[in-house]
């Protein structure tokens, strides 16, 4: 028996709110998941919704969520992920949407706080929807976060750093 066969497989959880086959972020997530599986990594994908074919060799689990609004369902999903992580051991949690409990975040989105402050009325940040999105973003980019960030462009890193000082130190541009 070789040393390699005695080693436990790395267990990574990928999380995203919604999978649909024509989304760019979703295609990136699935491509990364397949590349991990090819290297012997155990991948489990958590989502609230999955449209399309399930990927061969990759476990997909739809977590039940509640809420009448998108931001309420997103919060419910993040809470369900957190509960799962409290009872199951995983090596790494990779998020494709901003939420708490991530070890790594694949930053395909722009900075929500920048968009809110520059393009919309800053007063909107007091509405429940915007407060939730800002809390989720802060959970990833805030000063107290330890989440590692994989950015697809340096421009995104610069924008996040403007609103979340210190976040750039945890960013790697792909």
Which positions does each model-derived feature cover?
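N-terminal strand-loop element at the rim of the active site
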Residues: 9, 16-22, 35-72, 84, ...
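An amphipathic, basic-hydrophobic alpha-helix
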Residues: 67-93, 130-139
């Amino acid at each position: 028996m070789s040393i390699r066969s005695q080693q436990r497989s790395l267990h990574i959880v990928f999380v995203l709110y919604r999978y649909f086959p024509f989304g760019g972020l979703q295609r990136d997530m699935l491509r990364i998941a397949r590349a991990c599986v090819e290297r012997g990594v155990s991948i489990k994908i958590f989502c609230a919704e999955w449209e399309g074919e399930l990927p061969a060799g990759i476990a997909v689990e739809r977590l039940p969520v509640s809420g009448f609004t998108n931001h309420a369902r997103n919060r419910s999903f993040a809470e369900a992920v957190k509960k799962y992580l409290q009872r199951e051991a995983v090596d790494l949690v990779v998020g494709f949407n901003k939420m708490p409990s991530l070890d790594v975040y694949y930053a395909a989105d722009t900075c929500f706080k920048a968009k809110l402050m520059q393009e919309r009325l800053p007063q909107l940040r007091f509405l429940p929807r915007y407060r939730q999105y800002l809390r989720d973003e802060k959970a990833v980019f805030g000063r107290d976060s330890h989440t590692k960030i994989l950015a697809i462009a340096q421009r995104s890193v610069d924008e996040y750093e403007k609103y979340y000082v210190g976040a750039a130190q945890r960013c790697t541009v792909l």
